[in-house]
């Protein structure tokens, strides 16, 4: 019974899933990254019907984040499943993509 209660308590502490409306309100702190996000990422990552993981959706981003930032960067640059190559951001540099990935996964401010 103790294990069941502990699991229930942990589940109650988990953040509620983010909604597309909540994801649409999120913006990177850096103005340049915010502009790139608005122009290239937001249309899919704030749309619950796009198939892309929502911005700051911890449940969706956790397994991706565990793959490592280098893998995620490769997915963005090369394209992966529904993700178009370069994420439709031809103006983005590798550092921009890394900042966008950290923002999307709710790890903004972290480095490698």
Language model segments and positions:
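The canonical Cys-X-X-Cys-His
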Residues: 37-47, 100, 104
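C-terminal motif of bacterial Sec signal peptides marking the signal peptidase cleavage site
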Residues: 9-12
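Gly/Gly-Pro-rich "capping" loops immediately C-terminal to redox-active cysteine motifs
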Residues: 46-74
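Bacterial N-terminal signal peptides that target proteins for export
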Residues: 1-3
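Axial heme c-ligation environment in periplasmic c-type cytochrome domains
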Residues: 54, 75-98, 104-107, 111-112
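Short sequence/structural segments immediately N-terminal
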Residues: 30-38, 106, 110-111
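Short Cys/His-rich Zn2+-coordinating modules
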Residues: 21-29
């Amino acid at each position: 019974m103790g294990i069941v209660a502990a699991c229930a308590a942990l589940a109650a502490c988990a953040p509620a899933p983010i909604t597309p409306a909540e994801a649409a309100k999120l913006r990177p702190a850096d103005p340049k990254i915010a502009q790139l996000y608005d122009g290239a990422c937001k249309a899919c990552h704030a749309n619950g019907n796009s198939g892309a993981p929502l911005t700051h959706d911890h449940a969706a981003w956790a397994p991706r984040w565990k793959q490592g930032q280098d893998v995620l960067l490769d997915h963005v640059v090369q394209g992966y499943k529904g993700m178009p190559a370069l994420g439709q951001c031809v103006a983005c540099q590798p550092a921009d993509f890394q900042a966008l990935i950290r923002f999307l996964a709710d790890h903004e401010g972290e480095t490698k």
